[in-house]
Amino acid sequence: MFDRQSIHIALLLWGAIFALIAALCMFMSRNFEREKRRWMLFMQLTCAVLLCSDALAWAFRGGAGLSGYLIVRISNFLVFVMSDLILFFFHGYTCFCLFHKSGGKDALVVWRIRAGYLTAIVGVILVIISQFTNLYYYFDSENFYHRSPAYIISLLVPMTGMLLDLTLIVQYRKNVSREIFMALISYITLPFIAAVALLFYYGISLINIAISISMILMFVTAMEEQDQNLARKEREATELRVSLMMSQISPHFLYNSLNSIYHLCDKDVGLAK
């Protein structure tokens, strides 16, 4: 019989598998814009590593021996680092979706874009520092993970980056379709709700599950948008071919008609009229 932890780990692993499949689809696809494809690929790969690491952290928590000691520490480190890296890649993906067609950006927008990248980088640096200072978490003698008093900083840093992205998404929402807008918003709203819940409840990876759901939504909407773009391009190509064919037929038809009238003028003026 499965207990709650087994179901929890299974959900994380299935989320990782889907993220890997999505990454493979992005890698094999040649129909996406190159930069958009790259950002989506990085997001899905990072999400897969995040979910796998989280599953290992839960599976081996309290495990004895050197392998359990190493796996618990490495996997927890990767969970925190990947969370900030996903924010970095999401920020890049968001900026591409919002601005790749609009051209120039004002100074305030440029500042927010740079601040978004910087926030994610600061988050990674703080995670590295925490490995030597127990800033975010520590492990007891039985190899169990525990939060440190400053754990909330690990939530506030990515939330700051998310709020920056939220201002960009809301301000420039007209630059993207409704579906893409909702998918981008989901990455901010779902983890934010999970983070608030996580402050009062510990025992399940609510934030990472929320991130995986938003990754699914972004992948699905990106594929749907690409299908629509391909259908539009195919329709435009068909219309162009028809137009070219008609442009070739019309002069030929006109020449034949005038030639027939010319000959009828000599034979039957009434019929020619």
Can you annotate each of these PLM segments?
Residues 1-21, 151:
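Hydrophobic transmembrane alpha-helical segments in integral membrane proteins
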Residues 21-27, 89-93, 155-175:
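Alpha-helical transmembrane segments in multipass membrane proteins, preferentially the mid-helix core
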Residues 12-31, 36-69, 75-93, 116-131, ...:
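Hydrophobic alpha-helical transmembrane segments of multi-pass membrane proteins
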Residues 207-273:
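Two-component histidine phosphotransfer core
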Residues 168-233:
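Interfacial "cap-and-anchor" motif at the non-cytosolic start of specific transmembrane alpha-helices
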Residues 2-6, 70-82, 143-155:
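Short aromatic-rich membrane-water interface segments that cap or initiate transmembrane helices
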Residues 89-92, 96-160:
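Membrane-proximal helix-loop-helix units in multi-pass membrane proteins
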